[in-house]
Regions:
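Conserved acid/base catalytic micro-environments in cytosolic active-site loops
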Residues: 1-146
């Protein structure tokens, strides 16, 4: 799976989202290929919830759905949102809402993007705090999370 391949090149643990999986420090969670990724609070924990609801902007999973869902369980000011290479504009409108609510936003630059669609859409609507090459994004995320 994609998560298994990422585990061979990334230091943090990479898991594909599953119902009830806890979101925690040091863990990278990627959306399942056929379900929206949403979240629920379980006491002090935040857990993944998979949804097979209708596609949003023709996408399932949808970045817009995921970004909107996280603010229901975590204050926007405590989040760092990142948009990497991708086709289309999925996630841009939700990233703008996050940005307007105080979330720090990071976007992959055009030079290092295979497809500039999704990150370019975020830049075009003025929702990017940082536009960086792929190899600089992890360090920026760690700095912003402090």
């Amino acid at each position: 799976s994609f998560a298994q391949r990422l585990n061979t090149i990334l230091e943090p643990e990479v898991l594909e989202a599953s119902n009830g999986l806890e979101v925690c420090a040091g863990r990278v969670i990627i959306a399942h290929g056929s379900h929206h990724l949403t979240f629920r609070r379980d006491g002090t924990a935040i857990r993944c919830i998979l949804s097979d609801s209708a596609p949003v902007n023709r996408h399932r999973p949808s970045v817009d759905v995921m970004f909107d869902a996280i603010t229901a369980v975590k204050p926007a000011q405590e989040l760092v949102a990142v948009m990497l290479t991708g086709m289309g504009c999925d996630g841009a409108s939700a990233m703008k809402r996050l940005h307007q609510s105080g979330t720090r936003t990071v976007v992959q630059d055009e030079t290092s993007s295979v497809v500039w669609g999704m990150p370019g859409a975020v830049v075009d609507i003025g929702a990017a705090d940082h536009v960086l090459p792929l190899d600089k994004i992890a360090t920026c995320m760690l700095d912003l999370a402090k």
